[in-house]
């Protein structure tokens, strides 16, 4: 009988009619207990009829209707409250009070080495088109494990939009279960039976793969939303260095670019460039043996959202681990990939780039004119409109080559299977650090310090979104002394 109603006793508190589905993993039940008691799953000891519940199995833990389940464990912060209500300053607030005061988004509870999943979700959630598609997803549409993972992510996004800590905990537990079903390797456990730490890049890839199969563009012939907004193409040429062979041309698709970290790479841009021209040994039909080829790649389509992976891990055979390269590689808040593009794409990017340049020049002139004024502060402010960031015939593309950083996924530790993953996401002009369930404001300078070089958090995955051109709306009348909130999502082609 998978569905039962039980009583949960924690200290002096008794929670009646708690619905439990034993088809779910035990971690889902522990997430429910967290929602009721505030006790983190890793601090819980759950007992029924003298049997302790394990994290990975319901074995010997039999539940029946009205069974009494005992929970032992304390909250991380069981501090006595002050007897008198008094004004609190930001520096005196705890994490929950700070989140409420600053209207911070919900975090996701760590269910036992699940920080890699939490950080991935927080980064992907910054894409408004993806978030909207998940909120609109038909969870009854099936689709096997990919459909189950997409539905679970949809539920998680809904819970994070005001559902509260309890709803987020339960949603995260079901998301973990769906992730394990779609990618069983991520369900590996350590010697003690606890969930093993996983590579966040693998989690990112698995989630994107599922979304690619289940999210489609409205009004199209089942075109993948992921391919349109995250996918690009490369024009590739192969030239043999050892024989006079004809140049071989092909086209390759990508969902992310890689920045390989060598001794000479100090900046993201140089790491990306080095990947675009590389020597590769492969079989030569004319020579009848392996030969060295020069592979040259140029981007022929830019996606709206560009994912970049720092290739920081390599297999260390002696210790059988994916060891980490700690080298400092700087990355910018604003990224221009024009030089990585094919001549044909560069020509198509030029008109929008010229508009950016014209606006920047006009802003400089206005600033200089304002400084030279000897009169009051009154300004004429024309209402603004946001220009589309995509080509008219290619929704989900980037029409300028300009990007702005909107999420960073970092790793702290010495191997991909250990340490800790955290998401750092942009909110308007500000930044937030999403460390599992704890969300705190940080500065841009703190984000730029994530470039590596030590044991602090190192950038592992970067997510860049399109820079959106904001121009005066010529159809709107001139107004005076108007202040507008310009911290808004970019225009989207998805309804």
Show the residue positions of the predicted features.
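UBL (ubiquitin/ubiquitin-like) substrate-recognition surfaces
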Residues: 1-495
